[in-house]
Amino acid sequence: MEENMLARLMTDPAVEFFSPVIDRTVHLAQGETVRLLGVDPFLDRAVRPQLARNRPGALSFLLGEKAVLADVQLAKEMGLHSGDFLETNRGKLRLVGTFPNPSSEPLILMDIAHAQRLFGLQGKVDRVDLILNEDSGFRSRWANGFRIQSGQQRRATLSDMLRAFRLNLQALSLLALFVGIFLVYNTAMFAVVSRRKDAGILRSLGANRREVIFAFLSEILFLGALGGALGGIAGYFLSRFLTNLVAGTISNLYFFLRPVIPEWSWWILLLGTLLGCGASFLGGIFPLAELVRVDPIQALQGRTAVRGQRKMARNAALAGLAILGISLALLEASSIHVYFGFASAFALLIGTSLFTGLTLIKLGPFLRWVFNRISGLPGKVAAGNIRQNLGRTAVAVAAFMVALSMSVGLSSMIGSFRQSLVWWMSTQLQADLYIGKIGEAEVPENFYEELKSMKGLGGVDPFRNVQVSYRETSIYVSAVDPAVLQKYTNFGWLKGGNENWEPVKKGGVIVSESFYRRFKVQPGDRIVLNGAQGPAEFKVAAVFYDYSSEHGVVMMDRSTYLKTFGDHTINSLGIFIDAGNPHRKELLDEVRKKAQSLGLPVFTRDQLHGNILSVFDSTFAVTRSMRVLTIVVAFFGIAGALLTLFMERQKEFGIYRALGFSTPQVAGMTLMEGLGMGLVSFLLSIGVGTALAWVLIRVINLRSFNWTIFFYPEMGPYLLAAATSILASLGAAVYPIWKVYRTYPQMQIREE
């Protein structure tokens, strides 16, 4: 905004104090981006007293051309002292003192006049911070041409910006927790099975069923509570690592956020304990109920009753079918709120996990045929063991299937999003050079005019992107040259086509998909924006695909923007040169030199695309971490199932060896059981993971961010899931195989 409007502010009766601000960023030589505020130290004292306290070097701060103050934390991190120089992309800045900064954001202060010269903003300010004695009257007087936002509104805007991001992060965490519960369930079940003989001894000595259940359940709950408490502590330390990843993602996408070490709370311990106890109870109560119903002699002999398992598998499948029906209903309800979409994804995983028992029954003949071809009789026995011990194998397969499905679903979603982003860049960001960077430096308008008249250049697109208020929320307005974009780009159109640039040249606008979905606006509708001279009405010509902002973008001709907002600022320039121009390289070099002489950053098309993809990849670092954690959890689930089967069937193994099976053959049976469960888990994850990817892409992301991600099927996620299932199955079988080699048949069958 123009500096001369400060005179009007001084005479406004509602204004108690005001402070003009230059708000920009600079790149330090160390690679860190730091916010620089240009302020008037006398006017700013009333608005930001916390920054004015103990501010040394005031005279040097005012008189030094490139004198700055750094916040205490930033100076400490960089090892800077008064008199040192900061190397930045705007030249050397001399540190004349430090100040306490209550914010977590690294901050540099500079006198506003010096900041205006540093950024080429003579006669302009970025914003004015105010303290008012009356709000409504002030807003009515300054509504035209200015964006007025209270501190509370700004906090609400920032919270709204993070709402979808936070919601998605919480949902992914719950999915990982869902897989972890399977592990606790498996572990509790193993704890019961491994004590089967102890239960038989207690029953034979006169203990009744209630006493046995109480004794065993107390032990399981204690172990679950201990494990949950340790998990809570481990989760807290893991959060200290993940905080850096999340803060980096927020800084890249929304606003700078310095990572702060999470505070310890005893609620973490309590929550972990409750989750551990709950999962342990569910994992232990069913095998305990089975255990106390078994005759004490059978318990002493270690034999497992397998009656009714097929019926239970069919009943579980029917329950799973009902839950899948609920999942579809929740999917339909996701148009009301994205929470229903997340609930649908959970129901999908729960419902399909209940099909594992029936799947193992149906695939039993196939596994027997495959294993028989591989190793003969031991293979057939291994396939039969998987099918006959559904109470153990089905849970392990369900846990592993859910983990692999999450891996396939998340990988497919990330890969599809990345491919959609690449497609979007190839259609919309096609300039040969990009000059300037939002938040760092404005492109002088005379430089734009100079390049515009430069011979040999096909076109110059002056881009301005500014946040404005619309329907009591925030959107972005972008000013462009539609003639240049119509000639050199091929926007992805949701509704409309390249011919819709014509109405934009005549004062119309095009809107992004996120704006179209967020505000239910159709081509032909009219929208009203608050311009410099009052409300201005625009006709929507078309809707284009866009991934730059989930809050919505309204794009208009620069001439329309100037007429509406009176803002001549240019954030960046896109330079286009015809592909057949023989002097293409020389022209690009000349433009680059001119821009660099003005201190403007220059990027080639490939560099810009690479920077965007780098930000994208860092954004999903947390998602990838969670995917790895779920695989690790499921690995232990398979290992627990194999160990449980081994403990239950030690006598059976002894009989096999007494009948002539060699130790390697018995070990091979254990290995094949692990591979069989891994194979079934993988086969199920193909369908479930693809369905989960569809829900994430077409429902959750669309509802959360209001943009379309195109599904790009890739073999990578499925090959990764296949490799994971093989490696995890092999790794999970190592300990049971080791136990086979360490156990003698005469010890296993001594009671027969």
Regions found by a protein language model. Give the residues of each.
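Short beta-strand boundary microenvironments
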Residues: 34-77, 449-459, 463-523, 537-539
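Short cytosolic juxtamembrane segments of multi-pass membrane proteins
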Residues: 292-308, 738-752
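Hydrophobic alpha-helical transmembrane segments of multi-pass inner-membrane transport and secretion
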Residues: 163-200, 221-235, 275-282, 351, ...
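Membrane transport/envelope proteins' first extracytoplasmic loop
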Residues: 1-178, 193, 425, 546-629
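Alpha-helical transmembrane segments, especially those used as permease/efflux helices
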Residues: 139, 164-167, 221, 265-287, ...
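Amphipathic cytosolic juxtamembrane alpha-helices at the membrane-cytosol interface
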Residues: 203, 207-223, 306, 393, ...
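Hydrophobic, regular-secondary-structure patches
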Residues: 1-35, 61, 76, 136-144, ...
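Small-residue-rich transmembrane alpha-helices
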Residues: 185-189, 221-254, 267-293, 321-334, ...
